[in-house]
């Protein structure tokens, strides 16, 4: 009997389906116990009695199936500016400036300060915004670079404003013969008038080529043997042509009448450079002197500028007529005022960084205080200057002699003509001075460049006795229509003002 009881106990212990007395309750047991609810404790009863007076937030027993999401737009209860879009230094300057008394400044000084701010900061400080009503960073000005590039890269450029590479023909549009053109680096032998007439000096003669009709006319020929034409320059209106000669003369010709109006003699050596400023004609000589001629009066010689020790081969008046830039064989670049100061005719700036003769001199059409210069074989550099501060904004090694520089207002670019070894024309993007394109075709060094009145075509005269026309700045149809509309609106306003 005892053996049977032992076997029965052992069998019951070995059964796996029997309930375990000390095991935790199963899930269904816990759910059933929670549904039945525990006995109310004194603390819970007190809590229920305290909250019984509140109005229920929603219908009892109704579960909310709507999931609360973050609103897509801010509530708009307050404005918190983004620090990345706030120019804190400019804001501090503008706020502190309000408490300072205004100093009486001349218009010239104010304009100089505005030009400095534009070149150093990329924007005018007086027109800067302290805080912006948007968290997106503002677009940088075209071509402007600074160390905080990340602020400008956060905003994607709109598709409509993205620039695509334009097509630049690698071959000239037309090639003209230029026999007996003088292979002299220091002369300026071509110029394009506002009437679309190209003047070319070939040894002792001056020829006129009409780009509209294709007609060619010989304007003049030197009478004495051994004499030659050393420079030509059109007046802004395009009806008079100034001619410099190897015999130290400056002649003034009426192109319509094909008649010489006057012969001005004041230099002691050949006149290799000419530049107009309204009725003032400036001429640079091999002696290193620059003469101002008032073509309206009999006593034409009104001023002499002495700032070079060797030949003046580059001479350009600024578009606004306030400054005259001169480059010489003494490696100097001088910037002269339009009127003498207290000390007489003294250069405002003198740049000495070039290591070779400076013939290429060109003013920026849209920034009157920016000047581009290029050096000869010993220098081979293109430099951009701020003539107000005297700072060199940029310098690029062109790897060859720089013979001429022109600005393109359509595309904010420069084009330069070069000598040995490739004799090419190079287009540069301003102000980064990145190389855009190279135009090759000349077999000898480029001597001079000039631009058509519409700014689309560049003519290059070279020592290979050819004159090549490059349509490298032609506007696309959309931009051409915009410019035509703007010019038409401007002319209509002028007519209304005249009435």
From Swiss-Prot:
Localization terms from the record: Cytoplasm, Cytoskeleton, Microtubule organizing center, Centrosome; Chromosome, Centromere, Kinetochore; Cytoplasm, Cytoskeleton, Spindle pole
Effect of residue 385 to C: In OZEMA14; decreased function in metaphase/anaphase transition of meiosis I; does not fully rescue metaphase I arrest in CDC20-knocked down mouse oocytes; slightly decreased function in positive regulation of anaphase-promoting complex-dependent catabolic process; shows normal kinetochore localization
Pathological condition linked to this protein in its record: Oocyte/zygote/embryo maturation arrest 14: An autosomal recessive female infertility disorder characterized by oocyte maturation arrest, fertilization failure, and/or early embryonic arrest.
Gene Ontology MF: a single term: anaphase-promoting complex binding
Species whose genome carries this gene: Homo sapiens (Human)
Keyword Repeat assigned: yes
Pathway participation: Protein modification; protein ubiquitination
SUPFAM superfamilies xrefs: WD40 repeat-like (SSF50978)
Positions of modified residues (Phosphoserine): 41, 72, 92, 153, 161
Subunit text: Component of a complex with CDC20, CDC27, SPATC1 and TUBG1. Interacts with NEUROD2. Interacts with dimeric MAD2L1 in its closed conformation form. Interacts with BUB1B. The phosphorylated form interacts with APC/C. Interacts with NINL. May interact with MAD2L2. Interacts with CDK5RAP2. Interacts with SIRT2. Interacts with isoform 1 of NEK2. Interacts with HSF1 (via phosphorylated form); this interaction occurs in mitosis in a MAD2L1-dependent manner and prevents PLK1-stimulated degradation of HSF1 by blocking the recruitment of the SCF(BTRC) ubiquitin ligase complex.
Effect of residue 296 to Q: In OZEMA14; uncertain significance; decreased function in metaphase/anaphase transition of meiosis I; does not fully rescue metaphase I arrest in CDC20-knocked down mouse oocytes; decreased function in positive regulation of anaphase-promoting complex-dependent catabolic process; shows normal kinetochore localization
Posttranslational mods: Acetylated. Deacetylated at Lys-66 by SIRT2; deacetylation enhances the interaction of CDC20 with CDC27, leading to activation of anaphase promoting complex/cyclosome (APC/C).
Protein's recorded name: Cell division cycle protein 20 homolog
Outcome of swapping residue 157 to A: Loss of BUB1-mediated phosphorylation and inhibition and partially defective spindle-assembly checkpoint
Predominant location: cytoplasm
Sites of N6-acetyllysine modification: 66
Region (Disordered): 17-80
Lineage: Eukaryota, Metazoa, Chordata, Craniata, Vertebrata
Biased composition (Polar residues): 61-72
Domain of life: Eukaryota
Annotated consequence of substituting residue 490 to R: Does not affect its ability to bind the APC/C complex
PANTHER family reported for this sequence: CELL DIVISION CYCLE 20 CDC20 FIZZY -RELATED (PTHR19918), CELL DIVISION CYCLE PROTEIN 20 HOMOLOG (PTHR19918:SF3)
């Amino acid at each position: 009997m005892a053996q049977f009881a032992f076997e029965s106990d052992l069998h019951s212990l070995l059964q796996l389906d029997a309930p375990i007395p000390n095991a935790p309750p199963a899930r269904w047991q816990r759910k059933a116990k929670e549904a039945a609810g525990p006995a109310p404790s004194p603390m819970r009863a007190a809590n229920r009695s305290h909250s019984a007076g509140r109005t229920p937030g929603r219908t009892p027993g109704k579960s909310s199936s709507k999931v609360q999401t973050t609103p897509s737009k801010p509530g708009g209860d307050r404005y918190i500016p983004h620090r990345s879009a706030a120019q804190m230094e400019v804001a501090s300057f503008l706020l502190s400036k309000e408490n300072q008394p205004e100093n009486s400044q001349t218009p010239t000084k104010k304009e100089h300060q505005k030009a400095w701010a534009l070149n150093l900061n990329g924007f005018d400080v007086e027109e800067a915004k302290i805080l912006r009503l948007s968290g997106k960073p503002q677009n940088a000005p075209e071509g402007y670079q600074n160390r905080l590039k990340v602020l400008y890269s956060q905003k994607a450029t709109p598709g409509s404003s993205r620039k695509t590479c334009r097509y630049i023909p690698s071959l000239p549009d037309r090639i003209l013969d230029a026999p007996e053109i003088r292979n002299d680096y220091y002369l300026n032998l071509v110029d394009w008038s506002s009437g679309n007439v190209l003047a070319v000096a070939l040894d002792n003669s001056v020829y006129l080529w009409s780009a509209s009709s294709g007609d060619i006319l010989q304007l003049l020929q030197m009478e004495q043997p051994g004499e030659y034409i050393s420079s030509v320059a059109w007046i802004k209106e395009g009806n008079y042509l100034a001619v410099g000669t190897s015999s130290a003369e400056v002649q003034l010709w009426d192109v319509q009448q094909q008649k010489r109006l006057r012969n001005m003699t004041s230099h002691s050596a050949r006149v290799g450079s000419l530049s107009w400023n309204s009725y003032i004609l400036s001429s640079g000589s091999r002696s290193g002197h620059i003469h101002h001629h008032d073509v309206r009066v009999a006593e034409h010689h009104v001023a002499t500028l002495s700032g070079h020790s060797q030949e003046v081969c580059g001479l350009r008046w600024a578009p606004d007529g306030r400054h005259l830039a001169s480059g010489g064989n003494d490696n100097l670049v001088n910037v002269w005022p339009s009127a003498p100061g207290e000390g007489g005719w003294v250069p405002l700036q003198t740049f000495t960084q070039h290591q070779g003769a400076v013939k290429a001199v060109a003013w920026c059409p849209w920034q009157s205080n920016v000047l581009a210069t290029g050096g000869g074989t010993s220098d081979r550099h293109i430099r951009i200057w701020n003539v107000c501060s005297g700072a060199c904004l940029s310098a690029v090694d062109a790897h060859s002699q720089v013979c001429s520089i022109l600005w393109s207002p359509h595309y904010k670019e420069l084009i330069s003509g070069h000598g040995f070894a490739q004799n090419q024309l190079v287009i540069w993007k301003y102000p980064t001075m990145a190389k855009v394109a190279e135009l090759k075709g000349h077999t000898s060094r480029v001597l001079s460049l000039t631009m058509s009145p519409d700014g689309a075509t560049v003519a290059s005269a070279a020592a290979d006795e050819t004159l090549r026309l490059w349509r490298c700045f032609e506007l696309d149809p959309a931009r051409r229509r915009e410019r035509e509309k703007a010019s038409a609106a401007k002319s209509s306003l002028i007519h209304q003002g005249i009435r």
